[in-house]
């Protein structure tokens, strides 16, 4: 499926898009996250590690070098937020400064729009870390998918977004090394981010249709 998306790092456009998104009933959201330290800074700490004779400093340097987008929110930087309102339409916000990041975080915790997150534990820990709040209304599509698949075998119960939506969107995964601050404006990263949000929206719609079919079936046999 072809994805239509726009991106911005302009605070005025961010505010305009937020106003538009606030009129939707349902949106699908996804953060991209990178280490707080750039590759250049990590290289500098790697050099310090080689030269250091202090064990405490060595431990500190190793911790910095090992950080990535999956690390604790205190050790990471939010780089993108993608928000989709259909299976193929999305905005990608490049979180280039605190003004943009804070405006979007405020929207996420204040809006009454239903938010869809795939593996919400990952994204919501960042929202809570920065705001001390959670979104008012949200659905974790990964947990929902797990309930539908309901199989003890992990091989038959893969609820990763890429596995669930590969037939619709193809293989859009990118290498782990791409999740860094240097790639905030990379076209592949922007498309990846947009696809994540659109795929989450499409997955939710598919499960809603299946849920209605189940309810209709139960009504017919009752």
Locations of the language-model features?
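All-alpha helical catalytic cores of prenyl diphosphate-utilizing isoprenoid enzymes
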Residues: 166-171, 195
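Conserved RNase H-like, two-metal-ion catalytic cores of nucleic-acid enzymes
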Residues: 1-163, 167
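Secondary-structure transition/capping residues
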Residues: 115, 175-176, 211
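Active-site-adjacent bridging/hinge elements
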Residues: 169-180
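Mixed-charge, glycine-rich, non-catalytic linkers/tails in nucleic-acid processing enzymes
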Residues: 135-138, 179-222
């Amino acid at each position: 499926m072809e994805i239509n998306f726009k991106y911005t790092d302009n605070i005025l456009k961010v505010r305009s898009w937020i106003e538009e998104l606030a009129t939707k009933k349902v949106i699908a959201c996804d953060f991209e996250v990178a280490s707080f330290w750039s590759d250049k800074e990590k290289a500098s700490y790697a050099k310090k590690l080689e030269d250091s004779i202090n064990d405490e400093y060595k431990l500190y340097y190793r911790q910095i070098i090992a950080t990535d987008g999956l690390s604790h929110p205190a050790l990471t930087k939010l780089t993108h937020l993608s928000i989709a309102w259909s299976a193929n339409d999305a905005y990608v916000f490049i979180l280039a400064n605190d003004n943009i990041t804070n405006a979007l975080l405020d929207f996420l915790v204040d809006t009454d729009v239903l938010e869809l997150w795939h593996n919400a534990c990952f994204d919501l820990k960042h929202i809570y870390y920065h705001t001390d709040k959670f979104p008012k209304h949200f659905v974790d599509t990964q947990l929902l998918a797990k309930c539908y698949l309901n199989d003890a075998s992990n091989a038959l119960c893969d609820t990763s977004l890429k596995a669930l939506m590969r037939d619709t969107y193809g293989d859009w995964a990118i290498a782990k090394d791409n999740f860094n601050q240097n790639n905030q404006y990379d076209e592949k990263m922007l498309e990846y981010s947009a696809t994540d949000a659109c795929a989450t929206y499409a997955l939710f719609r598919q499960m809603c249709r299946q849920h209605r079919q189940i309810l209709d079936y139960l009504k017919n046999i009752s």
